[in-house]
């Protein structure tokens, strides 16, 4: 049963009438451009064919009812007439409440809504299940009440909800690619201007995501430390963000910086340049160059930004040994575990899957999870 059929059926059972709309918003994987988003830099993600789906209908009162199919059909209910505060027990509900509250704060006028939510974006894998939920909820209200919002505004609203209501710091990339993704394309995003450019993906190339299933523990504290180190670097150069520093300026004075901060800054500056070049390489179908850039990105995350772990490095090495210069592979996401992403000619996918199955668990004691994805369309009706 598809997520659409599942949510429509649950909706009719729970609320006693049929849903009028079904909306989807996808998860994402970032092909290159890691930790550049909060430095006002460039990222190159694509939306994937794992999504959050919401069957919904408008109400003629001010009540919001939300059922979470993936959390034992838990039901949250709140009123648009009262101040929206955090739910005491249901963490999932706070993503919904946060999006609704921040749409209100943006002076959007809308009435009540019934929703049933289900998704298949793997949670805790760094594939943006939370952003896909935020964008899906924003798109529901925009569609049901014809709100004057474009995809970028729905994305910004989701980011605001996550930062201010849920209380989790995040950049804008995850929401933006979920809202604006384009089938068979990646999206080069300028995280300062929020300008986007669709970049066509080479034909016959699979987007493979492999979850190391190494439990991320340091991710919150270390993420904040990296952010602070980048801000320290920007202050040293008297610039609003590292986006504004050139590699030449950095090289001239790198010795004056704290050695750790210097390594962090070097990663951001080189990663930004790699990301812009990667968009051109992809567009030209130059998988060899794309593979080189992904390898450089991984080495920079490992050695300069220091956010990889041995399990992730092992996975990357196993895949690289199979694909050689026919594709690319690197860690993706915040770091300290999570996933790797690989661009692999479709005919090599079985060999990669076999090599990983034979070697990864033997070397690490952990079983991986293997996803073959297609670059997919952003949020909308389904």
From Swiss-Prot:
SUPFAM superfamilies named among the record's database cross-references: GHMP Kinase, C-terminal domain, Ribosomal protein S5 domain 2-like
Active site per database record: 174 (proton acceptor)
Binding site for Mg(2+): 130, 162
InterPro entries in alphabetical order: Galactokinase (IPR000705), Galactokinase_bac (IPR022963), Galactokinase_CS (IPR019741), GalKase_N (IPR019539), GHMP_kinase_C_dom (IPR013750), GHMP_kinase_C_sf (IPR036554), GHMP_kinase_N_dom (IPR006204), GHMP_knse_ATP-bd_CS (IPR006203)
GO molecular function: ATP binding; galactokinase activity; magnesium ion binding
Domain of life: Bacteria
Gene3D superfamilies: 3.30.230.10, GHMP kinase, C-terminal domain
Catalytically driven reaction(s): alpha-D-galactose + ATP = alpha-D-galactose 1-phosphate + ADP + H(+)
Record carries keyword Lipid metabolism: no
Keywords: ATP-binding, Carbohydrate metabolism, Cytoplasm, Galactose metabolism, Kinase, Magnesium, Metal-binding, Nucleotide-binding, Transferase
Major localisation: cytoplasm
Pathway in which the depicted protein is active: Carbohydrate metabolism; galactose metabolism
Listed HAMAP family: Galactokinase (MF_00246)
Function according to Swiss-Prot or TrEMBL: Catalyzes the transfer of the gamma-phosphate of ATP to D-galactose to form alpha-D-galactose-1-phosphate (Gal-1-P).
Protein name (database record): Galactokinase
Species of the source: Shigella flexneri
Gene name tied to this protein: galK
